[in-house]
């Protein structure tokens, strides 16, 4: 039975003080300017999420503070097909704000949450100073048979460069007896991921244009 409490809903509840309704003081408190980085949950928050089956193995929370020129954030869930990344949806999900720079919030900052669902689909939710966004779960593979699974989530602060995709998650599944650990940088060299039954990636891209 699929959970009825997706990660983003729980994080909004458990991090209510940190989010501060997306005020200028939060949720960017942990992210330095021009970076995206893991959001450090305290033990109480981890325990609460774990009670709903959300752990560091299947969920991710990141805080970000985009460059001053950024007006949009795009999120893409891709699947490796014949050595090439293919978007699993008809379009790239994203949101932002347009208009003169002086009319926008002082900073584009927020919290991004990712959850791997039981059918292998991926859900993303963003709360930010530009507003909120949630995608329809993408990349479902309910009939996939696998015996091995490996994941790589963003674990270190990453500098944001406009219009350059940043891989934040790689998830691989196979039916063999062993599987090598994943490296996020393999997103840029997909040939390193050959031989796996299913590989999915999540990237985020900050842009000056919607």
Where are these regions (language model features)?
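Bacterial N-terminal signal peptides that target proteins for export
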Residues: 2-9
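Extracytoplasmic electrostatic interaction patches
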Residues: 93-210
């Amino acid at each position: 039975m699929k959970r009825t409490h997706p990660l983003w809903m729980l994080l909004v509840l458990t991090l209510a003080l940190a989010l501060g309704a997306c005020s200028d003081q939060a949720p960017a408190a942990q992210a330095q300017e021009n970076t995206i980085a893991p959001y450090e949950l305290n033990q109480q928050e981890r325990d609460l999420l774990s009670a709903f089956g959300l752990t560091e193995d299947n969920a991710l929370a990141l805080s970000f503070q985009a460059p001053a020129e950024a007006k949009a954030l795009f999120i893409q869930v891709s699947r490796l097909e014949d050595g090439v990344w293919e978007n699993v949806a008809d379009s790239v999900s994203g949101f932002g704000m347009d208009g003169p720079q002086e009319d926008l919030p002082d900073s584009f900052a927020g919290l991004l949450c990712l959850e791997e669902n039981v059918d292998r689909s991926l859900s993303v939710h963003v709360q930010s100073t530009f507003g909120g966004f949630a995608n329809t779960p993408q990349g479902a593979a309910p009939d996939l048979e696998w015996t091995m699974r490996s994941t790589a989530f963003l674990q270190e602060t990453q500098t944001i460069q406009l219009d350059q995709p940043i891989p934040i998650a790689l998830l691989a599944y196979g039916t063999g007896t062993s599987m090598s650990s994943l490296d996020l940088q393999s997103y840029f060299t997909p040939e390193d991921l050959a031989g796996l039954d299913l590989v999915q990636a999540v990237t985020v891209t900050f842009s000056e244009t919607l």
